[in-house]
Every structure is written in structure tokens, then in C-alpha cells.
Design a protein with these regions (language model features):
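Metal-dependent polysaccharide deacetylase catalytic core of the NodB/CE4 family, i.e.
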Residues: 297-300, 359-374, 417-419, 439-554, ...
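Membrane-embedded segments
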Residues: 64, 69-156, 416, 430-433
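Secreted/periplasmic serine-hydrolase-like ester/acetyl group-modifying domain
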Residues: 137-247, 331-351
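Conserved, well-ordered alpha-helix/loop/beta-strand core segments that scaffold catalytic motifs
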Residues: 120-129, 192-284, 538, 545, ...
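His/Asp/Glu-enriched short active-site or ligand-binding loop at hydrolase and phosphoryl-transfer sites
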Residues: 285-293, 449, 454, 508-517, ...
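C-terminal regions of proteins
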Residues: 268-349, 581-607
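N-terminal pre-catalytic segment of deacetylase/amide-hydrolase enzymes
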Residues: 350-419, 588-596, 605, 609
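Membrane/wall-proximal cationic-aromatic binding patches
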Residues: 30-93, 100-110, 397, 402-409
């Protein structure tokens, strides 16, 4: 082959390979740079580059929104739905990786000039003074060229058309392993723009010791010396955003999100004071940066990102809601006239004591009462009364799950020594034997009834006799007393294999091995919906608590039940619960002590202390 032909073949080969690479990147579009027209998987694209992918998403959906939230990654916890309700608006959260106020300015300008914008919420985080106008990665940290006048059209398209093919191939491979819940490759909720925290927000939270086991970063927090060299430039961009909003008639609200107390120690006090002092000279703002919330690690996902529950507190404080517990020192409206002492004290948040934000709640688990005790799930009426009497004489007060929710969500007080008494399955003995004893001592209790066994003494669709279960009339009488609540133990996800004829037996609430996620979610939804309708129809009381059969569950179980309005779930693991104000996760998979005939009154008291 002549040299000319060799060169020609080489050039043609290069062009063909380049065309194939461009076609692959255009079709897969792993950054959403071209609008992701084929796969339309923006939660994946936004994980690679939220700046570019969210722009592409809004180009197709901006008519669904009229308000926006801007800021670094911690801004994700600013709750879109809560602000929608408070403002009567449709917010989209434009959080991005990194804290770059220059990018916020460019995005705000594009939004105001091209979309309908009624409200803009800007989160100014401390790190906005640490970096500025920094494109650390041309694929993952840059803006769309339409938002960034410093990026040419040619530069933008060539970098994405000829990007490393491994990005596109990774997206195609992820399609095969995608699940209902978020994974590391699709961490965003494309509808809201926020991080998809369904998994993190479903995890049970309890004592500080348990939290440190799950999040060791808080046990040995990494410190480093940091400065804020770009405070002036940051404030110039904030001022530019303010001017843009004023000229366009956009309602601008500025907030400074919570910073974990240990992270604040990375900076010199005067450096931080100057940052917030400078912000106050530019615009009034809601300051949440340093408070008792900053001192409580359980309010943070990690060392820099506060939980969505804290975001709800932010929204409530900013909009004047009073139906949510908020620490008194959380959220100050700061202006140019705020006294100098305020900025000097920003590094001195006072932690709330454990007694101020949490309480210890033991939960007891019973099943069946009988004069003839033949197994570990039975307790005699005499022993049960002795146990209840011991609780009463020791100063314990039976509380309901409604009271626990009121404590966590609204900060309503609990008795000094609360205890929760529960019964699983809904046996008739709960009505004939336990209920009179509970009445005698004024002790509240919750009974978790199996729907398919409600009011029957035979196993479903068979002639097999079972221990009798109470029905609607008894349930109505007990709940009318104010002492008893009837809640769900599922409708038919606590099956007994010897009495089942099908091949797939649901002994518990877990997904069957042969079942897809979608089929499982549908089955669980139908089961709980049926259980709730049955029990609410019998008692007229809301059903929003579920005890897991055999204590077994998965993250998908918990997430699905939360979406159905279940606010409390219970396991069968032993231990005393640490219930924390502002953290509904402390009501998930709650611990319970299984109480048997062998537990003496003295042993019971020792167990729960």
C-alpha cells in the first residue's frame, strides 16, 4: 500500500471512529449535554453534572416551574414541596456540586432573562468564600454554554461529543442494574432537582452511640486550616443577583444554611464573622449557619450536609409555620443593622442537652394472654397484671404512638417515664383479658391486628381452627375508651406455611425471591391499603403505624410504607429507643422487648431502665 493510501485509510479510520464516538455520546448523553432525548434519564445525567443536566431538563420542563432554589450541594435539603405550599409556587432546586457563587450569578441571570421567575431562594454557604469562578473539571463542573458567556458553542459540544466513551458505556450498563431506589449513579430526583434521599431518610436513627457506629466521621472529625479568600467576589455576585431580581420584580430570599459545628473550627473566627458581616451589608438574610442544630451530629448526613428534616425547620422558620418543632435559636433574620456582637458570637453555638431534645422510650411486645401458657408468646393474665402493676408503681405512664409523633414533630412534652405497651396479631384475649387490666391501671396500649384474621377463629379460606381474634365491635369499644389504638400488622403478609396451598408464601413483609421490585411495591401497597381501610372502618381512627411481622423488613419496605403515610414502624429487636425531636427517623424500626411469662415484674423494670 502506498503512503498516500495508508494516510487516507488512517484518516478515514480516524473519522469513522470519531463519528462512532460522537454518535455513542450523542445517543447515551451521560451528562445530559444534548437534552438526553433518547433515554431521558436526567437523574443519571445530573449525578454526572448537575449544572448541565438540570439546564437541559429545564429547557424541556421550565413551564412546570416558576420559582427556583440556588446554591451548593447542601442546598438540596431546602424542601421544594414545603416552599411550594408556603409560597403558592412551583419550585425547582438547582443545587450543584461545589460552592461557586459566580455560577449562581450566571444561572440566575439566564433564568430571569429566559423563564418566568416569581421567587428565587439563594443559599449562601460558608464555602462560597472558599472557591469562586472555578471550573475544576470541563465535563462535570461546568455550566451549559447558554448560561456561561465564557464558554463557546464549539468548545462545549466538542468536549461532550468526544468525551471518554466509558461515560456513555457506564450509563448504558447502569440501565441494566437500575432499581426503584436511588443508587450511586442516579442520586437526584429529577422532578424536584434535590438529592433523592429516600434511602437515607428511611434509615432508623437512635442513640448517639448507634449513630457513631453508622457515621464514624463524627467520632474523629477531620480538621484542616481553611480561609475565605473570595469573600469579596462572592458578595459581588450576591449583589448582582439581588440587582437582577429587583429589576425583574423577582422575590429574592437569601439564607445561610446550617454548618456543622466542627467544620466551623476549620476557620478563624474573624474570617467567619467578616463573611456573614459582608453578606448583611449586601442583603438581609436568614441565618441558620450556627445554632444548637449545628452541635447535634444526628441532624447531619455527614460532616457538611444537613438532613432534609432540618430543611423542613428552615422552611418553617422562614415562612412562619408553627406546626413544627424548631429550636429557639435556629434562624435569625440578619440585616445591615444587626449588632456587631452577633457576628462575633457566630462561632459559639450552645448545644441543647440530651434531655432537651430527646427522651428514652422502652416498648414492650406481647402477643396472647392465656391461663394455659404453652409457648413463649403467651403470658398469663396474673403475670401480665403483675407486670403492669409494677410499671404503674414505678411511675411509668403508658403512651400512644400519636404522643410519640407529637413529641418528635412538634416538641410536645411526654411524661417523665414513658412506656409503650404493644400486642401483635390481634388475639381476642387482648380484649377479654388484657383490656380490663389496662383499664384498671389506666395504661394505654397499641394492638397490631392482622387484617385477614380480624374477627375470626379460622385460618383464611380453610377450616383450620386458629386462636380467636377480636373483630370490629371489640376494636370500636377499645378505641372509644381512649386507652387503646388499633394499628396494622399487615393485612395478609404474616402467613402460616402449613396452612397455605400456594407456592409463594408470605411469612413476612419481605419481597419474595421470585418477585420484581415493581410487583412487590404493588403487593405491599395493596396489602397496607386494605389493612388501613379495614381498621379505620372499624375504629374511625387513623392507621399510620405498622409492626413488621417477625420484625423483618427492607429499605424498600420502609420507603414504600412512608410513601403510603406510615409514620411509625416497629421491629422485634430488643432495646430502649432514643426518640429525638425533629428526627422522625427515630420512629422507624423501633426496638421492642419481647415479654414472656418468665419475665418477673422486677426483671421487667430492670430490663427497661
Amino acid at each position: 500500500m502506498s503512503s498516500k493510501k495508508w494516510v487516507l485509510v488512517f484518516l478515514v479510520t480516524v473519522l469513522v471512529l470519531a463519528a462512532l464516538l460522537a454518535a455513542l455520546n450523542l445517543a447515551a448523553d451521560p451528562f445530559g449535554a444534548f437534552g438526553d432525548r433518547l433515554l431521558s434519564w436526567f437523574s443519571y445525567d445530573e449525578t454526572n453534572n448537575p449544572r448541565v443536566a438540570k439546564f437541559s431538563y429545564l429547557e424541556q420542563h421550565h413551564d412546570e416551574y416558576d420559582s427556583y432554589i440556588l446554591g451548593c450541594s447542601s442546598t438540596s435539603s431546602f424542601p421544594v414541596d414545603a416552599f411550594n405550599e408556603a409560597y403558592g409556587a412551583s419550585f425547582y432546586n438547582l443545587i450543584m456540586y461545589g460552592a461557586d457563587m459566580r455560577d449562581c450569578e450566571k444561572i440566575a441571570r439566564y433564568l430571569i432573562e429566559h423563564y418566568e421567575v416569581k421567587n428565587l431562594i439563594l443559599n449562601v454557604y460558608l464555602d462560597n468564600g472558599l472557591t469562586y469562578d472555578e471550573e475544576s473539571d470541563r465535563l462535570t463542573k461546568n455550566l451549559h454554554y447558554k448560561e456561561d458567556p465564557d464558554t463557546s458553542v464549539l468548545s462545549y459540544y466538542t468536549r461532550y461529543l468526544f468525551a471518554d466513551p466509558r461515560y456513555a458505556l457506564a450509563k448504558l450498563n447502569a440501565l441494566r442494574t437500575d432499581t426503584i431506589l436511588p443508587q450511586t449513579f442516579d442520586v437526584f430526583d429529577e422532578r424536584t432537582g434535590c438529592y433523592d434521599k429516600r434511602v437515607r431518610d428511611a434509615e432508623p436513627i437512635g442513640s448517639e452511640e448507634r449513630y457513631l457506629e453508622s457515621y464514624p466521621v463524627f467520632a474523629d472529625y477531620p480538621h484542616q486550616t481553611l480561609s475565605l479568600p473570595y469573600t469579596e467576589q462572592c458578595m459581588q455576585s450576591v449583589a448582582a443577583i439581588k440587582t437582577l431580581c429587583e429589576e425583574a420584580g423577582v422575590n429574592l430570599t437569601v439564607a445561610a444554611g446550617p454548618v456543622y459545628a466542627e467544620y466551623l473550627k476549620n476557620y478563624e473566627p474573624e474570617t467567619i464573622a467578616q463573611f456573614y458581616r459582608s453578606l448583611a451589608q449586601v442583603t438581609p438574610f436568614w441565618d441558620f449557619s450556627s445554632s444548637s442544630v449545628s452541635c447535634e451530629m444526628r441532624y447531619f448526613y455527614d460532616g457538611t450536609h444537613f438532613r432534609n428534616n432540618v430543611g423542613e425547620m428552615i422552611s418553617a422558620r422562614m415562612t412562619g409555620r408553627t406546626d413544627l418543632w424548631i429550636p429557639d435559636d435556629f434562624g435569625t433574620y440578619v440585616t445591615a443593622d444587626t449588632p456587631e456582637d452577633y457576628f462575633l458570637n457566630v462561632l459559639s453555638p450552645a448545644a441543647l442537652s440530651a434531655d432537651e431534645i430527646s427522651t428514652q422510650v422502652p416498648i414492650l411486645m406481647y402477643h396472647h394472654l392465656s391461663e394455659d401458657v404453652t409457648n413463649s408468646e403467651m403470658v398469663s393474665p396474673e403475670q401480665f397484671e403483675a407486670q403492669i402493676r409494677a410499671l404503674s408503681e414505678a411511675g411509668y405512664t403508658g403512651v400512644s404512638f400519636d404522643e410519640l409523633q407529637a413529641y418528635v414533630l412538634r416538641g410536645e412534652p411526654l411524661p417523665e417515664k414513658p412506656v409503650v405497651i404493644t400486642f401483635d396479631d390481634g388475639y381476642r384475649s387482648n380484649y377479654t383479658l388484657a383490656y380490663p387490666i389496662l383499664q384498671k391501671y389506666g395504661m394505654k396500649a397499641t394492638i397490631f391486628a392482622i387484617g385477614v384474621s380480624f374477627g375470626t377463629d379460622h385460618y383464611k379460606d380453610t377450616d383450620y381452627a386458629i386462636t380467636p381474634h377480636f373483630g370490629a365491635a371489640e376494636a370500636a369499644e377499645m378505641t372509644a375508651s381512649g386507652l387503646i389504638s388499633i394499628q396494622s400488622h399487615t393485612y395478609d403478609m404474616h402467613q402460616w406455611p402449613p396452612y397455605e396451598t400456594g407456592s409463594a408464601v408470605r411469612e413476612n413483609i419481605l419481597q419474595l425471591s421470585s418477585e420484581s421490585e415493581e410487583a412487590y411495591v404493588q403487593a405491599l401497597t395493596e396489602d397496607f391499603t386494605r389493612s388501613r381501610a379495614l381498621l379505620e372502618g372499624a375504629t374511625g381512627q387513623p392507621v399510620d403505624v405498622l409492626a413488621y411481622p417477625a420484625g423483618q423488613y427492607s429499605t424498600l419496605t420502609q420507603v414504600t410504607l412512608q410513601s403510603l403515610g406510615v409514620h411509625v414502624t416497629l421491629s422485634t429487636n430488643p432495646g430502649v429507643n432514643t426518640v429525638v425531636k425533629g428526627l422522625p427517623q427515630t420512629l422507624y424500626a423501633m426496638l421492642r422487648f419481647g415479654i414472656t411469662e418468665d419475665v418477673s415484674p422486677e426483671a421487667l423494670l430492670n430490663m427497661i431502665q
